[in-house]
């Protein structure tokens, strides 16, 4: 069978398919035309998230996201849902540490109505007090759900340990205390500060006409008198190593091991992505094979790489029987040491590259993924990043680059370890971590 080779340039990746317009007030409008599809994915993004919140504001970005679908000057919450359902549209929103997005996907012929609904949600939310009280209770339940889900709760505990004095280490949801204090004044003040033109990005991907898109959104954003604010600058996150063990009566112990990693703009991020794939990013990865397939010590075990604008986190997660905790830690450390000492073949690296590249191209066939990718690249690089440019950067990574990355990430004293389950710190073999800390 002949080997399949990706075409040098797919028709929908030509630069002319990607357009960008900057309005007079700084709002950016970006489109990626995919003429082979019938759908359009549209997102209105704000370059703000939980890392921009003060301790008292923690969770306000997420609260705003929830409230935006509850009603506007022109539509009730029910009317928003009814209008979307009437055109077979899918719509949602999400809040991250650095961005907030309100998005939807419809047939291309229904794009004008989706644009009208999302811009109405974004520009004219009402934030009625009775709606706020109901949604506050919903968010309380969301917080409780996370705290009742061990791996999610451990993730929160780990981030507090890793970024102890920075908002990036706090929960996107906020806490019961901060959410309980939020009112209309706090929400409107946050919007005034951060929902400003230079932080706003409108992105569409699919069978969309850029000129018509600009024609619609220009009057929406250039004529709104309340669309201005302060634009506070972000502070650089400082990381912390250490140990945090939280005792809880569970069947398993859940483990997080993590350290500093490259940011979105660091050239070494490609080596880190490949290191992640090789160590614990798929079913043939070293941790999955050794811990799950060969030893049967865990059902869920993986590594992850989370880059941000100016920092990053590389981590390993496993859920295991408390009796096997130290064995899992020892295997994890051994596999990391093997890579940091050069035990990586050219064929293994080539397979990891193909895995990453293949995954990128597979997701490129979704208009939602294309829209989100275009937004990320505009926020980070202020331009469209061609797929071939990414492939070339991945292909340039050498065995030595991955080996150096493994050593850089886990070869210092900023390693953080968090565990949740029926254990205490005395149960952890700290020698496997080369760390010391205080249990809680």
Spell out what each predicted region is.
Residues 2-7, 22, 33, 77-229, ...:
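Charge-rich, well-structured scaffold segments of protease-associated domains
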Residues 4-39:
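N- or domain-start disorder-to-order transition segments that initiate the globular core
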Residues 41-105, 281-297, 308:
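M16/MPP (pitrilysin/insulinase) zinc-metallopeptidase core fold and M16-derived inactive scaffolds
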Residues 42-46, 118, 255:
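A short acidic-to-branched-hydrophobic micro-motif
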Residues 236-239, 290:
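Catalytic cores of enzymes that engage adenine nucleotides and/or redox cofactors via long glycine-rich
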Residues 264-267, 271-281, 287:
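A conserved active-site cap/scaffold subdomain adjacent to cofactor or substrate pockets
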């Amino acid at each position: 069978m002949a080997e399949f080779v990706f075409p040098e340039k797919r028709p929908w990746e030509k630069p002319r398919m990607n357009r960008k317009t900057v309005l007079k007030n700084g709002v950016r409008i970006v489109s990626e035309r995919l003429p082979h599809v019938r759908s359009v994915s549209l997102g209105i993004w704000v370059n703000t998230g939980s890392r921009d919140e003060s301790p008292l504001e923690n969770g306000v970005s997420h609260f705003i996201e929830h409230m935006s679908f509850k009603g506007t000057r022109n539509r009730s919450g029910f009317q928003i849902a009814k209008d979307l359902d009437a055109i077979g549209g899918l719509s949602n929103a999400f809040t991250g540490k650095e961005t907030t997005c309100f998005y939807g996907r419809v047939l291309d012929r229904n794009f004008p109505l989706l644009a009208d609904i999302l811009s109405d949600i974004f520009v004219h939310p009402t934030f009625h007090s009775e709606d706020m009280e109901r949604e506050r209770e919903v968010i309380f339940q969301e917080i409780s759900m996370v705290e009742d889900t061990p791996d999610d709760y451990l993730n929160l505990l780990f981030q507090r340990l890793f970024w102890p004095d920075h908002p990036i280490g706090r929960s996107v949801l906020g806490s019961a205390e901060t959410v309980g204090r939020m009112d209309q004044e706090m929400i409107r003040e946050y919007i005034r500060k951060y929902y400003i033109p230079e932080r706003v990005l409108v992105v569409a991907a699919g069978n969309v006409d850029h000129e018509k898109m600009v024609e619609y959104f220009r009057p929406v954003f250039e004529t709104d008198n309340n669309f201005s604010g302060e634009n506070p600058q972000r502070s650089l996150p400082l990381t912390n190593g250490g140990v945090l063990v939280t005792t809880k009566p569970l069947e398993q112990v859940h483990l997080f091991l993590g350290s500093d990693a490259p940011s979105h703009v660091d050239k070494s991020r490609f080596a880190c992505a490949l290191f992640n794939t090789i160590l614990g990013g798929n079913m043939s990865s070293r941790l999955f094979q050794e811990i799950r397939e060969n030893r049967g010590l865990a059902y869920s075990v993986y590594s992850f790489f989370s880059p941000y604008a100016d920092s990053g986190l590389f981590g390993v997660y496993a859920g295991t029987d408390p009796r096997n905790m130290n064995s899992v830690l020892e295997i994890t450390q051994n596999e990391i040491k093997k890579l940091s000492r050069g035990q990586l073949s050219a064929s293994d690296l080539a397979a990891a590259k193909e895995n990453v590249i293949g995954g990128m191209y597979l997701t490129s066939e979704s208009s939602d993924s294309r829209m989100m990718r275009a937004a990320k690249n505009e926020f980070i690089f202020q331009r469209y990043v061609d797929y071939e440019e990414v492939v070339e950067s991945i292909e340039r990574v050498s065995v030595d680059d991955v080996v150096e990355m493994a050593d850089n990430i886990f070869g210092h004293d900023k390693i953080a370890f968090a565990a949740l389950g029926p254990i205490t710190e005395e149960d952890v073999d700290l020698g496997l971590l080369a760390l010391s800390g205080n249990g809680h």
